[in-house]
Amino acid sequence: MQGFERSSTLVMEKARGIVTRVTKLGDTSLIVHWCCREAGLMKTVAKAARRTTSPFAGKLDLFVEAELVWSPSRKSDLHVLKEVEVSGFHPELRRGYAETMVAAYFCQLLESVAEREHPVPELFDLLRGALRYLSKSPADRRTLLHYERRLTELLGVGHDGVNAAAALERAFGRLPRSRKDCLALLGDGPNAG
């Protein structure tokens, strides 16, 4: 009886992405949610990332922009993260509570309206541009409303005379609860949403 040889070639994929959410997995690992230019919204597991000796240590924080390499899962939508090369930490997004809240809302909103693992480079570019803008300018109501309006345009759900938030709710259901918190934090203004 002759044995068979199994291919040891691993399939690896690469993309530029922004960390939109991070959750703990067990004692040492993390689940990292990404918005990627080439892969869309996706999740990876970073094994042993919470260990101080991990090659991921200090690299997997909210809003980090990086080149990532992962091994696709055949069984689920949770892929195995292999490498991360950070190109931007965006520490300015943590300079104030309002900037952090609005940036997090942008990520949550995108996750609630975009299809998983379906690349739409324009959505990545919108999020990236919004985070970069917030890194340089204080968070305000106008920025939040502009992001929502651009998102409705890119998704094809915006209509003349219809509030962007209302258009998003009509097309995708309830908006993230953090929107209300952001608007309260940013105060009343002429562009009340």
Regions picked out by a protein language model, each given a short descriptive name:
Residues 2-193:
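Non-catalytic alpha-helical scaffolds and adjoining flexible linkers that form interface surfaces
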